[in-house]
Amino acid sequence: MTRQFFGTDGIRGVVGQDPITPDFFIRLGFAIGSILVKNNTDKKIKHPSVVIGKDTRVSGYMLESALEAGFIAAGVDVYLTGPMPTPAIAYLTKALRSQAGIVISASHNPFPDNGVKIFSEAGEKLPDAFEMEVELALNQPIQTVLPHDLGKAKRIDDAPAQYIKFCKSTFPESLNLRGLKIVLDCAHGATYHVAPKIFSELGAEVITLGNEPDGFNINLNVGSTNPQTIKEATLKHKADLGIAFDGDGDRVVMIDHLGHVVDGDQLVLVIARALKQNNQLKGGVVGTLMTNMAIEKALNDLSIGFVRTHVGDRYVLETLLEKGWSIGGENSGHILTLDQHSTGDAIIASLQVLKSLRLLNQSLYEATKDSPLYPQVLINVETSKKIDLENNKSIQDVIKIVESKLNDKGRVLLRPSGTEPKIRVMVEGEDLKEVKFAAEQIAKAVEAEV
């Protein structure tokens, strides 16, 4: 069965356009709720429960109410947290012993977009099979349960305090952040009211940007996808480093004191190196098809195993669980540290990097300067139709020519975006000029076919 609604990271789109509408969200809440009720075999649980959180988009109020109505109509109790980071909902789902967690967010996208992400009772992103079951259930009519079986809704007023305490618990009590000046960029998003408290309570001097959400400014010229803002602030304030989150708090990039952007790949390497040095690394590291070749080489030089999986933190998680490893991530800043949390958490990942720097006795610059990334050029080609990239002779002929020129000192990756109507062309290698030319040639070949 072909997916109609779910992409690589939940459901996402423009508010007011299918499927990001109130009526669809009522149906979605009822569909998921009906599955939870059907799967509830614990007689002690009269009503399954879900935790619903959201980021700071103005549309979150409308969509939250619609989801809430759908779940209650299905006989499911609802816990409402208000604006909270995506990984906070994963944590609270476990802490409140709920059967699922729902986040209303479009992550790093601009405010007109919104969507949903779903977590299991274990605080993990749900497998493809569950999403397919939801897709099927969406085709069924809503049949509200009998009045005495309706669910109830409750606000969790101390959700921020619970999450702050949890995040701080992942940082060793023997360490602190005293003496560090840190610039935080909360992207006017879901971390705005929790992240500054966490880092300051651990001892850091914190300068905060992007902490004044108004419903419309999430990710607007701030956050992990706009690192120039925090780069300028880090240099201006002569800070030791900068930390930028995305709108829902599951991605992070950092800035060293000289203004260099440190992406998710490099941050994973820092964490893995410190764990290896302290004999605490479980197995190896999981990256994705987008992970820079320089990181793979650096891990190999440290005798740390490395495997690639599909793009998307859910696939990184699946591979980590299969192998029994604990560290993985994406260059975009999704970083999983399974010894601390069941999903990618930007705040916790940042704390693990800071812990690693303390253990290595290095600055962020010192910890990353010896592993410069290979030049990587990414071109997004907009498309309105699906293309069989693997079997398109014109495109594949160009790729073969490029790969022969790169030899074993570079690579090509061509894939459709899981969240946008685009085809992503990525080329990386040691020589920037050669890499840029190669990416442009492949992009032209793709454009000719769309």
Regions found by a protein language model. Give the residues of each.
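Active-site nucleophile and cofactor-binding loops and adjacent substrate-binding regions
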Residues: 78-87, 261-264, 288, 309-310
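Short glycine-rich phosphate-binding loop at a beta-alpha junction
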Residues: 44-55, 181-183, 283-289, 424-426
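Phosphate-binding and adjacent anionic-ligand microenvironments
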Residues: 241, 277-450
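An N-terminal, well-structured beta->alpha segment
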Residues: 1-69, 73-74, 153-180, 387-388
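N-terminal small/polar loop signature for handling phosphorylated ligands or for N-terminal nucleophile
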Residues: 34-38, 42, 49-113, 197-255
